[in-house]
Amino acid sequence: MLKHFIYIISLCFCISAEAQRLNKEVLYDDAICRLYKILLQASYLNTSDTLYIILNDKSIKVKKVNIISNDFPQLRVGESRSIYILDTMESHGKKLCIHFNICQLIQESISKRRIVSSGCFVFFYKVRKSKYYYYTYKEYGI
């Protein structure tokens, strides 16, 4: 009887941990959608533009969407383009933070590119009953 009880408790714990992991993966997609809406409202981006998000870590998983590209843009010499570097999420107690570094990619020559950072967006999520809820965002610039 005790073995069955322990088995059921461990099974519930595993299911809860799996749901929590899946919930964290959805947070990246949620933060990307919120960033896209903020950029549209501020007129930094048009609806026909591509949002270039470079993943800073291989463990980050995001859905493929038409408006988002995870590759560096193709530029001519002298051109520049805004890109956003997505960092891994950080946990601070009952809060989670997702950082997007705002960068400018500059094509200086055929083989030389330069990335200049100009600030970041930070999205905050709170934990309530083992689920994450969007709290607020902050925009930092240089």
PLM feature spans:
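Extracellular/secretory pathway and lumenal proteins
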Residues: 16-18, 37, 124
